[in-house]
Amino acid sequence: MTFGNDSRVLITGGTGSFGRAFVKTVLDRYPQIKRLVVFSRDELKQWEMQQQFPIEKFPQLRFFIGDIRDKNRLGRALEGIDTVVHAAALKQVPAAEYNPMEFIKTNVLGAENLVQACLDTDVCRVVALSTDKAAAPINLYGATKLCSDKLFIAANNIKGDREIAFSVVRYGNVMGSRGSVIPLFISLKDNKLTIQNQSKKIDANSLKKNQDSKVSLKRKPVLS
């Protein structure tokens, strides 16, 4: 994904692991970008990012406190935005089983709120981050992300004559992201490590690899 000097970008979940890496990459590669908005509900993490990216050095960076469950707040944040990267989600698999409606409210209803808010504004492209767990899901988290994916892809069929494209990007486990196994290993580095799930193997991508990846968007995404 490339941005021009006039690009106005908003990232939901902008204070998360991916969001922080995305913001840093965009500011490094496209320092002349017109606007980059971090949309998230975590006030403390926004403050921490403001210390990392001071406004004196990065005047194009803005912070917007809000929740994707709130469509009206989303609509306000999207004013003047042309590109949206959707990274906001609840993602802890065990937590989803005990709090199913909370995951549905954020991952499914939140996605629909974003779709409708984008259709009501001048956004021209939306990239939603997904997960390999949405393919043939075996848990509630994966099921909510599959529903989210379907909502974004289906939005291409209801956009009418609006110049907007919705896309979904799926990737696997990300090393170093919040809730991944790497931070757990680091926290246990001074203790004895018990080996569990000896028969299971997983593939994982580095956070840098994910945030460095270029996504090619077509004006009319292929539906499958």
Model-identified regions with their sequence ranges:
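Rossmann-fold scaffold of SDR-type NAD(P)-dependent oxidoreductases
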Residues: 12, 78-87, 128
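Short, conserved SAM-binding/catalytic segment
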Residues: 49-58
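Conserved Rossmann-fold cofactor-binding substructure of NAD(P)-dependent oxidoreductases
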Residues: 62-83
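NAD(P)-dependent short-chain dehydrogenase/reductase
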Residues: 140, 146-209, 220, 224
